C-alpha cells in the first residue's frame, strides 16, 4: 500500500494575527473594540471616516489571515529502490578494532511513531541489522538522568533514560555491535552552552553531588549491561568544555570526573566487561585550547 508523507509549511506570519491571539505588546483587541462606539459619538463625517477605517482594518486582517492558511504539499513515497549518486570512498587497511560508530539514540521514539527502515534492496529490515551488515561495530546512545517533567511527560529528543539505553544496547548486541554510553549528567541535552544540573542533584554540595553521580553511573551502567548490552566505552559527560552537571570550577569538575570514572571501573570489574572511559570535549581543531583543557584535567 502506498503511503503519503505530508509536509507542512507556514507561508508567512502576520503581526495582526499574533496580536489578536494575545501575544502582542499592547492590547490591540481593546483598541479595536473601542473604535466603533467612539465613531458613533462624532459627527457623521468623522464617524463615517472612523467607521470606514475600522472596517478597512478588519477587512485587511481577514484578507491577511486567508493568505496565511497552511497549505499541504503531498509527496508520494517511491514504490521501489531509487538509485542515487552517493558514494563514500573506502579507507584501506583499517584495523579490526577501528570504531565505526553511529548514534541512533532516538531510534525507539522513531519506531514508536511509525518510522521503518529499508535496506539497499528496498526491503524493510531492522535498522540495527542494516547497520551491522554495512560495517558498523559501535552504537552510541545518550543517557539523561530524568528527562521527564512532574507529570511524567518527556522533554523530547527521544526521552533517553537508562531503560531506553538498555533496550538499544540489547538490540545492538544482538547483531554483534558494542555500545558507547554517553552520560550527559543532566535531565536534557548538555553541551558547551549549557550543563544543567539534574533536578535530583540541585542544591547539593560537591561531595554529595560526586557521590550521587558515582551511584547513578554504577546503577545505570549495571542495568544496561544486565539487559544484554556489550558496553565497550562510557563517556563521562557530554561536550564538557565549560562545565559538567552544573559545575564550572575545575576542582569540582575533576572530582565529578573521578567519581564517574571510579563507577565505570567498578562495574567493569564486577561484570567482566572491558570498558574504556572517555571524556568528551568539542572544538578539537583548537589544539591550544584542547591542550589547556587536558592540563586542567590532569591537575591534582
Predicted segments with their positions:
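Bacterial N-terminal signal peptides that target proteins for export
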Residues: 1-9
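Hydrophobic helical h-region of N-terminal Sec-dependent signal peptides
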Residues: 10-14
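Residue-level signal for mature regions of secreted extracellular proteins and peptides
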Residues: 16-17, 48
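Alpha-helix termination/capping residues and helix-transition junctions
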Residues: 17, 96, 133, 226-228, ...
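C-terminal motif of bacterial Sec signal peptides marking the signal peptidase cleavage site
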Residues: 19-22
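N-terminal, intrinsically disordered, polar/charged segments of Gram-positive cell-envelope systems
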Residues: 27-79
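N-terminal substrate-binding region of glycoside hydrolase catalytic domains
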Residues: 69-167, 171-173, 178, 184-212
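Active-site cleft segment of glycoside hydrolase catalytic domains centered on the general acid/base Glu
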Residues: 154-155, 159-166, 190-300
Amino acid at each position: 500500500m502506498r503511503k503519503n508523507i505530508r509536509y507542512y509549511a507556514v507561508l508567512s506570519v502576520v503581526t495582526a494575527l499574533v496580536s489578536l491571539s494575545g501575544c502582542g505588546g499592547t492590547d490591540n483587541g481593546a483598541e479595536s473594540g473601542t473604535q466603533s462606539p467612539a465613531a458613533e459619538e462624532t459627527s457623521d463625517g468623522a464617524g463615517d471616516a472612523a467607521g470606514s477605517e475600522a472596517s478597512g482594518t478588519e477587512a485587511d486582517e481577514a484578507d491577511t489571515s486567508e493568505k496565511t492558511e497552511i497549505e499541504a504539499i503531498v509527496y508520494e513515497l517511491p514504490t521501489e529502490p531509487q538509485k542515487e549518486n552517493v558514494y563514500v570512498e573506502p579507507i584501506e587497511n583499517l584495523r579490526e578494532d577501528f570504531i565505526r560508530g553511529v548514534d541512533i539514540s532516538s531510534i525507539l521514539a522513531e519506531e514508536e511513531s511509525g518510522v521503518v527502515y529499508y535496506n539497499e534492496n528496498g526491503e524493510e529490515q531492522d535498522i540495527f541489522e542494516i547497520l551491522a551488515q554495512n560495517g558498523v561495530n559501535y552504537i552510541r546512545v545518550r543517557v539523561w538522568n530524568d528527562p521527564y517533567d512532574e507529570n511524567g511527560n518527556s522533554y523530547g529528543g527521544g526521552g533517553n533514560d537508562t531503560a531506553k539505553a538498555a533496550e538499544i544496547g540489547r538490540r545492538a548486541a544482538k547483531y554483534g555491535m558494542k555500545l558507547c554510553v554517553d552520560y550527559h549528567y543532566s535531565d536534557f541535552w548538555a553541551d558547551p552552552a549549557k550543563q544543567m544540573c539534574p533536578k535530583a542533584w540541585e542544591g547539593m554540595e560537591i561531595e554529595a553531588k560526586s557521590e550521587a553521580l558515582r551511584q547513578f553511573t554504577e546503577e545505570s551502567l549495571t542495568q544496561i549491561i544486565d539487559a544484554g548490552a556489550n558496553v565497550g566505552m562510557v563517556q563521562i559527560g557530554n561536550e564538557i568544555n565549560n562545565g559538567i552537571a552544573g559545575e564550572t570550577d575545575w576542582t569540582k569538575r575533576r572530582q565529578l570526573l573521578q567519581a564517574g570514572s571510579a563507577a565505570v571501573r567498578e562495574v567493569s570489574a564486577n561484570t567482566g566487561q572491558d570498558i574504556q572511559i572517555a571524556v568528551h570535549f568539542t572544538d578539537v581543531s583548537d589544539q591550544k585550547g584542547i591542550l589547556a583543557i587536558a592540563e586542567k584535567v590532569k591537575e591534582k
